């Protein structure tokens, strides 16, 4: 029996499937390992290459196996699927992972540290609470609309409705309706308080990260966007050959439908990290709204773009540019400089 050189590891909650091969590709190990005996099993092996799909708990196992001396590579599940043969089961999945991790063109995911994952938990919890607050706001608006009470859009309008609910002297709201609406209003206020706490924690994390502070200097990037970029990409910035590769990974480049030497570009791919894409486009929209009010003297490129393209198309193009600038600042260790400063230099 040959020495194990490469292992494909299909992870799950309780039982993990191992598929190991030697230098000739011959199968040496094909077995299931319980979670409790996982580290003991890999501790008994000589250091080897271990492939894992980038799914829940993958970063945890990646850190644990690297601590044992193994070389761990995480891969997007969609890229591994091409190597799956016949029926899908744990054994076949592990074999596909083992095959995929050895491919020279395979793209890998950087293993995140616990600190990065903690920051991402703040972002995901924030997303959840924002959605819940929006649901409560819509419910309050819908219920009061049935009573003929409406208000303006946005949080200011919701605040007006909350004031009506709190006013016991407003006879437009029946007592029974006021009782149930008061429950929703208290939940709305509680969510606002929790969101404030999460935002303070994000700001503290942002201030503790020198890279995150440098990213904040880019117009369109604030503490939320900066911390999301640093936490999501981590040490993987140099895995992108250029800023365009980063923008493509986020999904901010046109979709190609080219054949026969003829290039045809469509709308953006919307592949990759949806959350980062949403944040960058939102930041770009803020820059455009500011430019619409105060002019584009410092950014003539943006002025020309806004003149010939719809606002949302311009926002996506600007988001692409922001992503490229972020890559250059992190990879080259630079700081953001305004276009006017660059021209004078």
Regions found by a protein language model. Give the residues of each.
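A detector of single, family-specific signature residues
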Residues: 1-345
